[in-house]
Amino acid sequence: MSSVFDEYEQLLAAQTRPNGAHGGGEKGSTLKVDVPVFTLNSDDPEDRWSFVVFCLRIAVSEDANKPLRQGALISLLCSHSQVMRNHVALAGKQNEATLAVLEIDGFANGTPQFNNRSGVSEERAQRFAMIAGSLPRACSNGTPFVTAGAEDDAPEDITDTLERILSIQAQVWVTVAKAMTAYETADESETRRINKYMQQGRVQKKYILYPVCRSTIQLTIRQSLAVRIFLVSELKRGRNTAGGTSTYYNLVGDVDSYIRNTGLTAFFLTLKYGINTKTSALALSSLSGDIQKMKQLMRLYRMKGDNAPYMTLLGDSDQMSFAPAEYAQLYSFAMGMASVLDKGTGKYQFAKDFMSTSFWRLGVEYAQAQGSSINEDMAAELKLTPAARRGLAAAAQRVSEVTSSIDMPTQQVGVLTGLSEGGSQALQGGSNRSQGQPEAGDGETQFLDLMRAVANSMREAPNSAQGTPQSGPPPTPGPSQDNDTDWGY
């Protein structure tokens, strides 16, 4: 019978093979779009700033068509480069579009002066200037910037110009993070990240764009695979560039942490809390199929190479193989573990229609049971004595008991806590009154009491690590739809 299992494993491997691995697929058979991309032949600070404003205006213009917006956006992201033509050539390495490079020698009264090699007539140059002047109505001051007169302020030198360029590019990169996932709810996270870069000095407040401009840029990114291919190539270069050597690629590398593995959260959370915890529940026969599936998915992720973290941004069809419905039971167990071990998952909407509430409850129980358990490998490496192990287990048990009665200011209402706003406030108030704890605002006193309890437990080192049982598990999310308790022992 072993041959049957071998054949089954090979079948799973064949089903999870990345698309296009055999070669001979369609390459360039669809119609190619001509995307005009602008480059500047001058290093003059004022000309470079005029070029950036020109590209930004076209990228958000209401009169510009899609290819023109896409080309202007690529030009905007290349505007920091010493030789822009070489940088633009990176974007041309694709089968989705053909880039037509239009060289600009300078600007005269806001009108670009094209090089003769570009073959752009004076009439067409005037048309580009008219398109650049058609901004969204929400830009009330007639510029893409919230601060009026920001674009008319001439830069002092090339350093000032680069700071302005990076301020705009940072806002463009921030929009990439949720361009392909939850773009309709991206305003809050974009504002938070822009504020972060302002505090770091990477974005100047004077050159903050209108939200409608960022939304238009984000829509262009969603609609254009050519732009997204260029963005991924820049993200790869940012990861391969040594830290501290390039201001621009330091920024790209920082933004990369928000973009990598977007859309794969369920897969990596399942690996972290379902596989990496190495609980005895993995021996259940009912989880063997999901574990085998995860094994094949990990192999598929490695086969994707450098493009694996950017499957969502590229619109890769292989991303659907990583959906949690493919390993629903193991996913349910992992989310039960995460709901107890990691309160940071509170903002992740893990409750799905296909979730098994039985396996979710099993994960909760295992996570609570592991709260005071000891990692034997780490204990052996630290050379802990039996008395120290018992003391550590007792301290962990004591902490779990103390924290259950303390009003934690970070507790949030949500599916993980099972509390409504009124219920959580009543619970916190009742706990303070019954236990005689300080008021909610006195968090320092509560923290000191907690640390004293831990220190006392470590000094006592009791002979037995057993304590009172922990409080009950958190409520099961969603209605109870399965009463099957056969775990396949």
UniProtKB/Swiss-Prot annotation:
Region P protein-binding: start-end pairs: 1-375
Complexes and interactors: Homomultimer; forms the nucleocapsid. Binds to the viral genomic RNA. N0 interacts with the phosphoprotein (via N-terminus); this interaction allows P to chaperon N0 to avoid N polymerization before encapsidation. Interacts as N-RNA template with the phosphoprotein (via C-terminus); this interaction positions the polymerase on the template.
Residue span of region Ncore: 1-402
Annotated stretches, region: Ntail: 403-489
Main location, first listed in the record: virion
Pfam families named in the record: Paramyxo_ncap
Family from the record: Belongs to the paramyxoviruses nucleocapsid family.
Name under which the protein is recorded: Nucleoprotein
Entry annotated with the keyword Cytoplasm: no
UniProt domain comment: Ncore is globular and carries the regions required for self-assembly and RNA-binding. Ntail is an intrinsically disordered monomeric domain in the C-terminus.
GO molecular function: RNA binding; structural molecule activity
Amino-acid positions noted as binding RNA in the UniProt annotation, renumbered to this chain: K178, R193, Y258, Y348, K352
Keywords: Capsid protein, Helical capsid protein, Host cytoplasm, Ribonucleoprotein, RNA-binding, Viral nucleoprotein, Virion
Any one GO cellular component localisation term in the record: host cell cytoplasm
Compartment(s) where it occurs, according to its Swiss-Prot or TrEMBL record: Virion; Host cytoplasm
Highest taxon above the source species: Viruses
Biased composition regions of type Polar residues, renumbered to the chain: 422-437
Its biological purpose: Forms the helical nucleocapsid (NC) in a ratio of 1 N per 6 ribonucleotides, protecting the genome from nucleases. The encapsidated genomic RNA serves as template for transcription and replication; encapsidation by N is coupled to RNA synthesis. Forms the encapsidation complex with the phosphoprotein protein P. Before encapsidation, the newly synthesized free N protein, so-called N0, is chaperoned by P.
Key word Zinc present: no
Gene: N
Region listing for Disordered, in residue ranges: 421-489
